[in-house]
Amino acid sequence: QIDKIKNWVGKGNTLITIARGSSWAINSELINESLVESKKDSTYTRKRYVDAREHIGRERIGGSILSADLDLTHPLAFGYNDKSIPVYKNNNVFINKTKSDYSSVAIYSKDFHIDGYISDANKKDYVPRSASLIVSKIGSGRVIVFADNPNFRGTWYGTNKLFLNAIFLGNNISVPTN
């Protein structure tokens, strides 16, 4: 199935992925991008089973508002006038900034935390190294990769224009190489 999708995109088509779909595209090697990896702790400490739910839950992002820095010259940013854009993040999908200098459309701002709970580990280790929106090239086509859901419940209007631009302008976006 991956080869069929890769072949279809490579013929000049556009695929749009959102959140866990973006994670799937990276993990299945559909696109040549990567997720931000956790820093490995070389010391092993056994943890009590009874604490698992609390420890794992602490790292989840249930709903936070983060600030992203938008490249206003990119076609996906058509119609935006301010490079600072609030994005709603309710997942732990952290996508590395692209290898191409021109394809990280929205990266999280230096002072990214606007509102909502986000753990210290996510603040320090993940978000600063991540992009909210990238474009990845496959042959003559492209995959538009959203780390966050730009259409969250139909209530988050600040980023849905990015999604509409992906739909209507996607086939006209080229991915310059360095």
Task: Walk through the language-model features, giving the residues of each.
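Alpha-helix capping/termination and helix-coil
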Residues: V9, N13, E29-N32, Y80, ...
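Extracellular ligand-binding/catalytic regions of CAZymes and related secreted enzymes
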Residues: N81, I85, D101, I107-N178
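Proline- and acidic/polar-enriched loop/turn elements at helix boundaries
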Residues: R20-G21, E37-S38, D148, N178
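Residues that flank catalytic or metal-binding motifs in active/ligand-binding sites
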Residues: R20, L72, S132
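Short alpha-beta junction capping motif
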Residues: Q1-A25, S140, F146, A166
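An acidic, glycine-rich "communication" segment
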Residues: S23-D115
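Active-site-proximal structural scaffolding
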Residues: Q1-I2, V9, T17-I18, I61, ...
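Generic recognition of flexible, low-complexity loop/linker segments
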Residues: D3-I5, E54-H55, G63-I65, N90-V93, ...
